[in-house]
Amino acid sequence: MKRLLLVLCYITLLAGCQKVVVEQEKTTPPLKPTQLIVGTLYGPQIYFTSGQGDSGYDYEMAERFANYLDLELKMKPFANISELYSAMHSGEIDIIAAGLADTPARREQFRLGPPLYRVNQVLVYRQGTPIPRSVDTLKGEITVTTDSSFVDTLTELQKSNPDLVWNQEKDKDAEELLTMIAAGEIPYTIADSTSLDINRRFMPELREGLVLKRKQPVVWLLPPTNSDKLMSELLSFWHIEKRSGTLAHLNEKYFAHVERFDYVDTRAFIRAIDNKLPKYQATFEKYAEGIDWRKLAATAYQESHWNPNARSPTGVRGLMMLTLPTAKQVGIKNRLDPYQSIKGGAKYLNSMLERLPDSIPESQRMWFALASYNIGLGHVEDARKLAQSQGLNPSAWRDVKSVLPLLQKRKYYQKTRYGYARGNEAVHYVDSIRRYYDTLVWIDNQNMLLELKQKPLQTAEAKETEEKPQTDAIQPQQP
């Protein structure tokens, strides 16, 4: 009997323990995530990787959002928009940040975040292709990416143009279609205006045609359900970034300097990369001293078009167009020696960087330094004070850039310490260097991708050579 009671007590205890475990499982809160997983697409203005690290508008915003949430950022690139959608619906990613526009179709599938920037949808064709006067004349000649906002636009246009048809590419992104346009493989596509502006630096043959949709918001996509907290956090973050000027800064950083396009200049620069840059690249890399060598090379191209014998009526000479006093200051004896010129230019540019106030953030210091290289640090400091007097941020390049042209107007320059300066030229100077730099980065990335593609082929060829029987070996002579 006692034994039976002991067994019953033991069973009761086990049942009680099981009950506690079940109750604990019910009340234990879900584990807090440690990562923000962001689905994206590769693209110059979206997300790309290089020897200098990760970059892109959406990447920078995602990095800031992850920091705001105190989470580790994980960028997860996909091959196309369809795969992005599938990953979101399966719960593989938390958010889509891929330069996608706000459309009715996307509103039906996802929750849309606040607008980051706005774009026009434009018809794109190659120089020499007949200029399209209306979309309805291009039956079957337009190619767009599957699931893109351009499909929605064409579907809408089809209601008033029933004969309008187009081709869709599932396995090619918008940039690949622009490449096909430049190569003459397809006649027409549709692109966002920002994407076209950026890609024309690398493919100057691209031309802008009809504007099909104006000022379309670019947004992030969130899951349609169970995303209330994430949406609330995103809205709070967006308001902070907008008030602080971060959104405006990123828009200026990625888009403002590419709006000015010069076909002849772009073609000449791409030719110079092939014909002239190889002579001096190692020297740029050697003397960059902490500066990205491509920024130094871009500066030299803006100064002299990489001509070591360049001269100007004002007395500046050489590849980096140094004045005589500047050459003496940096210890250069022969300004027409390209290697001395690069060394001196790098030293002078670094000195401009060092003399800038600490209040200027690292990401913008180079633009201030380049403006100082062009018109002098004193004039740039005048522009900073002028910006501050107008309620602008003297340490934000976008704000100082907006007031630099005022240094040419008597109303403003007579109140400054250093007087008149051609501020509009400094703005153009910096914007041009930024465009040249972006082109060099893009070409570097393309070369890196090409090398990665070639490695498996080279490995396979080497393995095949090793396994091949040596039929051509020298045979010993017969006696």
From Swiss-Prot:
Enzyme category, top tier: lyase
Position of the signal peptide: 1-15
Subcellular compartments: Cell outer membrane
Comp. bias regions, Basic and acidic residues: 461-470
GO biological process terms, semicolon-separated: cell wall macromolecule catabolic process; cell wall organization; peptidoglycan catabolic process
Disulfide bonds, paired cysteine numbers: none
Membrane topology designation: Peripheral membrane protein
InterPro entries named in the record: Lysozyme-like_dom_sf, MltF, Solute-binding_3/MltF_N, Transglycosylase_SLT_dom_1
Entry EC number(s): 4.2.2.n1
Residue segments, region Disordered: 457-479
UniProt-listed Pfam families: SBP_bac_3 (PF00497), SLT (PF01464)
PANTHER family: MEMBRANE-BOUND LYTIC MUREIN TRANSGLYCOSYLASE F
Protein role: Murein-degrading enzyme that degrades murein glycan strands and insoluble, high-molecular weight murein sacculi, with the concomitant formation of a 1,6-anhydromuramoyl product. Lytic transglycosylases (LTs) play an integral role in the metabolism of the peptidoglycan (PG) sacculus. Their lytic action creates space within the PG sacculus to allow for its expansion as well as for the insertion of various structures such as secretion systems and flagella.
HAMAP family with a match to the protein in the record: MltF
Protein name, UniProt field: Membrane-bound lytic murein transglycosylase F
Protein species of origin: Shewanella pealeana (strain ATCC 700345 / ANG-SQ1)
